[in-house]
């Protein structure tokens, strides 16, 4: 699969030194960006799926820790955000026509990773909206050996509206052709670039807040504002559909901040209670972005994720060796 060189601002990312950005073209002819941080002795690849408004560079520090643990890392700019192709003339509008389009983005990155012969096995790590996309992907693909999530968007915390009212506004606005209007209470500005640290819903750590804020100030082309009504409606619909599905068979480790205010906490708890080989870990104290808390916190989370992936890689290898041994015994 063809790929062209794309910018990756590793100076603001503070990521591992072996960093490369690539442009990929999806099957519906959109240009998206992928970032690849390479380990010298990788024993697997982690597909890092960011949330809404996010971009590759935001996960530089996370990638550094994952690479130190022996993994290659692929981070994705979803269509409509980061440096990937924007979908509306108002480039600050967070918009998508259907959530299934994000699966096209992920499929494109997987195809490229296959053609580039990135090391297996493959794992998936999804945050917020990326957690929603990743959960859908686990139902579609056998390729991912295990999964991890942080603050996954398996439901949206509708603060100022009841859920039924939120559905009504989102659906009616979309049907009336108003799908590209901003969702009520949101606007055409980046939250992290404009909000104050005090009272923010993302992190308790001021240094990490400034890390994110400075990235957006130095590269304003990475900024994204509020979601469109259509995005909001499609997000409500996708999370409802996912909630009705059984849990995937892959092992899962999920982290949730104790003061989560962005996504639906009950949806996460219900999902993890029904995930046979899943574990939910509450980070105390923690906001929505637990990987953007203090270094001691996020490094501990990332180390635990790597142990989770390594453990299930080892179990798979042992099972495979045992199956091969039994097959040889049958032949003798």
Listing of model-derived features with the role each one plays in the protein:
Residues 1-25, 30-37:
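An N-terminal hydrophobic leader/cap segment in hydrolases
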Residues 94-114:
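Alpha/beta-hydrolase active-site loop
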Residues 129, 133-219:
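Alpha/beta-hydrolase-fold enzymes
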Residues 248, 254-256:
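Short beta-strand/loop motif that positions the catalytic acidic residue
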Residues 250, 264-273:
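Short alpha-helix in the alpha/beta-hydrolase fold that links the catalytic acid
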Residues 259-263:
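Acidic catalytic loop of the alpha/beta-hydrolase fold
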Residues 279, 283-332:
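Catalytic active-site module of serine/aspartate enzymes centered on a nucleophile-bearing elbow/loop
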């Amino acid at each position: 699969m063809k790929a062209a060189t794309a910018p990756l601002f590793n100076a603001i990312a503070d990521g591992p030194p072996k960093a490369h950005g690539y442009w990929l073209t999806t099957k519906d002819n959109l240009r998206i960006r992928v970032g690849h941080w390479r380990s010298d002795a990788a024993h697997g690849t982690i597909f890092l799926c960011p949330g809404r408004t996010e971009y590759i560079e935001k996960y530089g520090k996370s990638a550094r820790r994952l690479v130190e643990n022996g993994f290659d890392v692929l981070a994705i700019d979803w269509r409509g955000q980061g440096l990937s192709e924007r979908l509306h003339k108002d480039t600050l509008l967070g918009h998508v026509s259907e959530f299934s389009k994000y699966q096209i983005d992920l499929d494109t990155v997987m195809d490229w990773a296959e053609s580039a012969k990135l090391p297996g096995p493959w794992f998936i790590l999804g945050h917020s909206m990326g957690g929603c996309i990743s959960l859908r992907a686990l139902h579609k693909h056998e390729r991912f050996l295990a999964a991890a999530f942080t603050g996954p968007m398996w439901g949206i915390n509708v603060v100022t509206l009841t859920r039924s009212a939120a559905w009504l506004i989102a659906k009616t606005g979309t049907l009336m052709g108003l799908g590209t209007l901003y969702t009520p209470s949101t606007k055409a500005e980046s939250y992290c670039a404009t909000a104050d640290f005090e009272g923010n819903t993302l992190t308790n750590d001021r240094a990490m807040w400034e890390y994110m804020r400075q990235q957006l100030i130095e590269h304003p082309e990475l900024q994204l504002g509020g979601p469109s009504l259509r995005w909001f409606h499609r997000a409500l619909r996708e999370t409802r559909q996912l909630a009705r599905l059984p849990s995937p068979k892959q092992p899962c480790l999920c982290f949730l901040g104790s003061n989560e205010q962005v996504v639906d906490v009950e949806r996460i708890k219900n999902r993890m209670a029904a995930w046979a080989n899943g574990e939910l870990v509450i980070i105390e104290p923690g906001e929505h972005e637990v990987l953007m808390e203090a270094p001691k916190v996020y490094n501990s989370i990332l180390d635990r994720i790597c142990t989770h992936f390594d453990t299930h890689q080892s179990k798979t290898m042992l099972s495979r060796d045992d199956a091969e041994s039994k097959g040889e015994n049958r032949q003798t």
